[in-house]
C-alpha cells in the first residue's frame, strides 16, 4: 500500500498548461487590454500616491477674534423709550467654548434688574389662569421660569397668570431684533492657529510659518494660505447672507484639510481651507430658531443680588481639522502591485468569453447560417477544441457504442432495465480524429498490401445487402454473426449489441479487423512493447491476447482512450475474438467497470 505522504510530495511544483493561439485579432485585444490596465494601475499609483503609508493627524486649534462693533438699541426707563449707543469689543461678543469652536454674538435680548422674589409668570401659550384652582403650589413646570405658589394674580390689565417664585420680572418672550444689533460683526476677523502632528512619521508642522504676512486676509484665489478670516467673507464663500443669519444665529463649519506628501523629493504640506453651513437653515423656525443661549451678569444693588439676563443669538464656528500624511513605504508598494496583478487577467477572461460565445451551439445552429459576416467567427470552434478537453463523469451507467455504418459514436448514460443495448437511443458524440502518427507504431505486418481506395474490400462495409443469418443469431443482430450472451439475465442486455445499426456486412469480415484485432503477431508485438520480457507461451497467454484484442478493437473504433475505457464491443466481434483466443473453461465475465 503506497504511503499517503512523502517528502517527494512536498518538494514538487505544479503549473498550468496553456494554449497559445496565433491570432492577430486576439493578440490586438490582449495588448489593448493589457495597456489599458497598465495605464490605469500606473495612473492610480501616482495620482493617489498608493506607494505611501498614510497616517492620520493629531491636531490642536487656537482662535483669536478681533473687531469692535457699535450698537444702538431702544431702552425703556420710566415708561420712556430712548436710543442708547454702546460699544462691543472682543470681551463682550465672544464667549469661551470647549473644543475647536468659538462663538460670536450677533444679536441679543436683555432682561435687566432681575432679583429673586414673587411675581406673575409671563403669559405665554398655556400659562394663563382664571382662578387659584388653575395653579398648583410647589409645581415646577420645565417650561416655567420658577416655582408656583398656588395663587392666580394679574399680569396686566387683561391677563392673569400663576404667581411664581423666580428671578423677577420674568423674561418676556420677545422676538429677536431685526436687523441684528451686531450686524457689523461681519467685519470681524478671526485668526486660526492650527498645529498638527503625524506621530507615525515623526513630523510636526503648523499653518502659521515664519515669514508669513500677519496683516493678510484670507482669499480663496489670491491668498489661500492666510490664517486670518473675515467673518463676512466666510458666509460669502458658501452663498449665505450674514445679515440674515445674524438675526437668529447659526452654526458654521471651517474645514482645514491637510494632504501632506512627506517624501523628501516632493515634500508638500499645506492646509486647504473650506467652509460649510452645519445647521439646517430650512428647519421650521418657530420650533428651532437658529442658535442661541442665555447667560447672566450678576451685581449687587443696595445689598440685594441682581442680574441682567442676556439671551444671546450668534454664530458658532466649529473648526474641523482632518487629513493624512503619506510617506514612501516599500511594503505598501509591493502590496499594491500584488493586488493589481490580477487585473491583467482581464484579457484572458474577455478572450475566453469571446471564444466560448462564438463556439457555442447557439451560434453554430442559428447565427452562422443566417449571418454571412459571422462565418469567419466559426474559427473559434477550433480554438475551443484546442483549449478545452471535455470530460464525461465516469459513472457505472456510462457506455459508448460504435456502429460501422454510422459516422458518429453513441453515448449511452442510463440503466438498460432489460432492454437490449442495440435498441437503446443515446446521445450522438463526434468520432475523434485519428492520430496518424500512431499508425507508425503498428506491426510491420499491417504495412504491406494496403487497400487501395475504391477496391471492393474497402467499400464492402458500406454496402447494404442481404446477409445470410446464422441459425443462432438473435433478433437484434443485423450482421448475422452475433451470438446470444452467456451473462446472467440481469446483465445480458449489456452484450446484446451488433456492429451495425442496419442489415449489412459484418465488420469481422474486413481485412483490417483481422490484421488489427485478430493478428497474433500484432498482438504479441503490443504485449512485448509493454512488457519486453513477457513469456509468450503457456495457458495464461491466451487471456492476455484476448484482452489485448479487446483493447485493440476499442482503440481502433473509438480512438479516444477515455471512450475506449467504457466501450462496449459488439457481440460478433467479441465472439470472434473469443473463438480465436478461447478460455479453457469457456465461461467469460463480460464488461467490467474500469473505475
UniProtKB/Swiss-Prot annotation:
One of its GO terms (biological process) is protein processing. Signal peptide: none annotated. Disulfide bonds join 119-168, 129-152, 135-162, 216-226, 260-269. Zn(2+) binds at residues 479, 499, 506, 572. Residues 360-377 are annotated as: C-cys anchor. It catalyses: Ca(2+)(in) = Ca(2+)(out); K(+)(in) = K(+)(out); Na(+)(in) = Na(+)(out). Residues 1-22, 354-595 are cytoplasmic. Glycans are attached at residues 74, 187, 202, 213, 241, 284. A lipid is attached at residues 4, 362-363, 374, 377 (S-palmitoyl cysteine). The chain crosses the membrane at residues 23-46, 329-353. GO terms for molecular function: ATP binding; channel activity; copper ion binding; extracellularly ATP-gated monoatomic cation channel activity; identical protein binding; lipopolysaccharide binding; magnesium ion binding; potassium channel activity. Keywords: ADP-ribosylation, Cell membrane, Disulfide bond, Glycoprotein, Ion channel, Ion transport, Ligand-gated ion channel, Lipoprotein, Membrane, Palmitate, Phosphoprotein, Receptor, Transmembrane, Transmembrane helix, Transport. Phosphorylation results in its inactivation. Changing residue 143 to A: Reduces the affinity for both ATP and BzATP. Homotrimer. Interacts with LAMA3, ITGB2, ACTB, ACTN4, SVIL, MPP3, HSPA1, HSPCB, HSPA8, PIK230 and PTPRB. Interacts (via C-terminus) with EMP2. NCBIfam families: P2X (TIGR00863). Contains two P2RX7-specific cytoplasmic domains, the C-cysteines (C-cys) anchor and the cytoplasmic ballast. Palmitoylation of the cytoplasmic C-cys anchor prevents receptor desensitization. The cytoplasmic ballast contains a zinc ion complex and a guanosine nucleotide binding site. This is P2X purinoceptor 7. The lineage of its organism: Eukaryota, Metazoa, Chordata, Craniata, Vertebrata. The gene is P2rx7.
